[in-house]
Amino acid sequence: MRHLFILVLFSSFLFSCTSQDVKVDAKKSQSHYNLGLELAQLNLFKNAVEEFDLAIQFNPEDPKIHRKKGILLFGMKNYEEARDSFQKTIELDPEDAQAHINLGMIHYTSGNKDEALKSWEYAIGLKPDDNDSKALNNIGNIYKSKNDLSKSIEYYQKAIAYEPSNSTYLNTLGDSYRLKGDLVKAEEILLNSLKVDTNGMLTHFNLGVLYQTEGKFKKAVDSFQKSLNINPYYTEAYYQLATSLLKTNNKESAKQSLEKAIQADPNNLKFQELYNKVLAS
């Protein structure tokens, strides 16, 4: 750590000159790039960005440096600069699929789902044989949010073809089948997801919602409780648990579940309304 600190001070002193004074030097660029990676691993993100900037000064045409810098800036929630870095990467290497995927994440985070969809669909078309499962899953998520369930299922299945044991992909696929009304298929896939990851919090939650839909409220209660055992801060699970408990005439437990939800999220009107109904009943 002391060695890294000295290197940071040294590089800041030695390379404080303007970019106009710097000539292309691939070796020096790589040295700063490597130091930036080390600093990022130590969570010294600001210092890491500075090293990536120095790496870019010495070799401004290297797309991987711009992409790495963009990823770091995205993690720091500096979305505008991250977008600029990914766009520069694409300018230097139009076939950098990961840069297109990352740019899509910027659009998605900014609420521009249509632009995100364009970026991701373009990315998966660049190299058909590459594992584009993340982009495919992201596309599925957008179609799911648009309630185009046939499309969402199509893309989730494509993602799973690359990673058949990815519990996240299985979970989203199963929930799409639930929303489409194919409850048997949904349960089969969600249970398979739990075989891959028994601690899949959202999978247990989605199973609970599935069992609610089927009117199997005791099984729903069990699933929501398992979800909360894994993540006791997932407030929606408390709410859904309470609704299922009420269906089994367990008013006191439902009240306690809602109290936990309200304690975690006191401004949630939905939680408060159901709680008031329970008290009044």
Residue ranges and their predicted role:
Residues 34, 68, 75, 102, ...:
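Canonical tetratricopeptide repeat
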Residues 41-42, 75-76, 109-110, 145, ...:
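Register position in tetratricopeptide repeats
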Residues 24, 58, 92, 126-128, ...:
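Structural marker of alpha-solenoid helical repeat scaffolds
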